[in-house]
């Protein structure tokens, strides 16, 4: 009955926003996020006390239990009492492995605070910094939990003094990151002060923890904890009673994480660029339960019994079953069939969920992560939420086919569902070879997806060796080329040139988008990237790989009628470039003039697409074409004596050492290395450091492949795709 009673209690408290907190737990892989979540669940009576710390209740996929890492973000609503008052804490546990970082960035959008978990032994690592930065960019307030303190006592046998020094170092590093990445008004305000209780220390596995004020109040001395560990395992219950972990962490959350009404006031201007003085804007700023319904979807799951479940935060209004809503991005109406809240893998039904809370919804089967849901009558007044920025990009691909050809329809269906749940997995069909291509953030991401296909859909698949995804680009301007339609009745005059770095970063960061107000976009491009006025005003399209189509024509007859076809032709040409049929990145395509046939029958897609493609391809092949390869940033920590070995490995793999820092007897090496060179990196690093290196990696940027390797690489990619090894020449597309 505990769960039922709690659900009823929780639904009641959810109406009073002062008693609600929306938080996430985020950390580097293996620093103990999910174990912390479990200890919090045990305290809320959702899993038994005995198995907490080992249960990994939020890791409810078998894959996660076995690997001991979180793959998806899981949600739960917890009940907690602080100073005699009940609170609801909506908790999201997010993945820490870099291959799953897209899930973490999506979770940041719907929470107001984050518990940053740092391993006391490993300290601040790459992903710690990456996720803290993502949180601060979304104006999510951090608190800190320093975990695995038991390892400092038992394994490293540090004295209380040394342990304290370790704590001071970690807090200092986290505060430096807050000062570096937080918006101006929060740089000082959000600095963490252990004396105030903004940092908790403890062991999630052994389920104890304390903050400085709590230790003072209860008379706990650190030497008491060290003494209890000397007594061995049987002393743990005493320690758990003395310093209950959930009390330390959840009291800290209630005290320092703002409630949804407070948080939306300063978070909304950052994540929503609509008119804050409009009816919708005011309702969201006030988190008004009686305002127009607005919900932001941050996650979708396929439930084998119920179909698609969309999870998200209600920013204003009240979400009720049976109501019709408008999906802004999908541009369609759908009906809310069921509203519920999450208790780990369970969904508990609710009649309604009010603004400021996290809800799970059935019925919105066309919703995807990032969708803005609004009451139907406001559909024409709603500006969608800002696009979510992903930390990584899909850089590794495998070709897959079912072992049994009869399973092909089943595989297509499973891949479709998988790409809905995880938008950072990209599924494509190679039209020429009929292969299904699955692209992900890294080898582990792909591996988990394949395991998922086998275990959830019973599909045995054959997968190729992982292939690196490249991008095609150019380094020079081309002259204007004439692209003719096959029937010779339509002619398009097109040139190409590389986009400058500033424009690329404006598009990548979501500051410039295809569907923003053209005048506003032109202003930003002129002022920030130095675009000429005529070009800045006349952008027709921006595709997902950061290519831009500009129309500089004047007075061309019938051009309006074929505009959409030309844009579609541009998108198709950018999907597969001329050099190796890899996606194109960072190219500006300019239409200078055109002759279009007056009869619609002579200017259909079959005529316009080839004209667009041929002119673009010829232009690219004369503009110093190249391939870009994905580069990863590495952050390695190892004992000082292995520095030489690590440097040798990185330089052999075409890597570059960016920085070497000495932290006591430990060297921290920041480096960059091409993804193509990382497949056996883990084994090599372990071998060269006797297993003592710890490291994290994240996607850094795209960089041109060295000229000495370019032609050979192009030939290899073309051969793999069943194309002629030699790249085409401009005259293959345009009659000179």
UniProtKB/Swiss-Prot annotation:
Keywords: Cytoplasm, Elongation factor, GTP-binding, Nucleotide-binding, Protein biosynthesis. This is Elongation factor 2. InterPro entries: EFG_II, EFG_III/V, EFG_V-like, EFTu-like_2, G_TR_CS, P-loop_NTPase, Ribosomal_Su5_D2-typ_SF, Ribsml_uS5_D2-typ_fold_subgr. GO terms for molecular function: GTP binding; GTPase activity; translation elongation factor activity. The keyword GTP-binding applies. It is found in: Cytoplasm. The keyword Protein biosynthesis applies. Residues 18-261 form the tr-type G domain. Belongs to the TRAFAC class translation factor GTPase superfamily. Classic translation factor GTPase family. EF-G/EF-2 subfamily. It comes from Staphylothermus marinus (strain ATCC 43588 / DSM 3639 / JCM 9404 / F1).
